[in-house]
Amino acid sequence: MGQIRTKIPQVAILLETTHGYSRNLLQGILKYQNLHGPWGIYFEPGGSADQKLPSKKEWKGNGIICWITNQEVEQSVLSARIPTVLIDPWEEYIVPTHPFSKYCQVRGNSHEIGKMAAQFFLEKNFKNFAFVGDHPERKWGRDRQIAFTGVVSQQGYRCYSYVPEFQEGYEAEADRKRLARWLKKLPKPVGVFAAIDVRGRQILAACLQSGIRVPQEVSVLGVDNDVLLCETANPPLSSIALDEENAGYQAAELLDRLMKDRSLKGTVITYNPKQIINRRSTEIVPSSDKLIVETLEFIRINSGVNVNVADIVKYMNISRRTLECRFKSSLGCTILEEIQRVRIEKIKSLICETALPLHSIAEMCGFDSESYMGKVFKKFLGCSMIEYRQKHSALK
């Protein structure tokens, strides 16, 4: 039986809505309060400049959930002296001498994010690796770099790194040109891990303007899976989806407990990456064999058609035996296995990122029936499509 309430808790949520990351966190917070509230919520949509607490005369608050991005919010939260949960606090806020170090926190597991990115490129048989960071003072970015570089190094490979110079007089255009020059010098093909999606878009733009082919020469993977940013990139950006909605839910749950028991201060909860959402920026498996690259591109653009090995051999104008041998030598799989892999990836993407009925997905992926697609899907992943959607959907 829940604790009897005598009044509705007043909670301020300071999260900018310009990022998919923070919107997903907000969804999780609202989900918790809908189940366990009600709360009286104070929230202002907008960017970081719009995030501020109302005056104490206007608002008698009981709790705060916040992502602090400027000093004004920092000072207002400190002076509020009410139960607060910090989400992904900056490095300066978690050093033992800072008052925020004693606050409850929900943090992303940046080491696991970096490891996931490295494994992703290694499984695609890359031999060249690079990392592009965001602000050098952001600990989460450095942690992602350390983990990514560490896994790559353990496999005997070198990782090239680029970190922007945020100094006095910094200019975005100058940084873009410097980034483009750096990308040109990288050994190709190369798998590039961007600390966040915004950086991933900048890499793609620099490649486009410099005539660097994506993904044939440079494959790019971001973090956050901000769908608007990723889908409007050229080409669309692959990204690591984080469990942000669950993080928001846990932040709200932690605040609820904290408002009832202030002795919980200092509790830290971490949330993990969920999965990699594959888009065109990483769709080509690296190979020095131009025939293989062209074949993979043909398979990709026909992922919604019931294309078979004979169709591919005819299009490439080469004997099946020769193409199969070069495929096996270059990629370690058969042509049919690659066709099936690409189709499964498309099914997974449509299941996770849309609410389309399964029979519509079957049509879009070149299957004659939903039932046959379901059999193929279960053979590869060991679960039904409904089970997969329930577990991985970005829309839930």
List where the protein language model places each region:
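Bacterial carbohydrate/catabolite-sensing allosteric modules
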Residues: 1-65, 71-320, 324-325, 329, ...
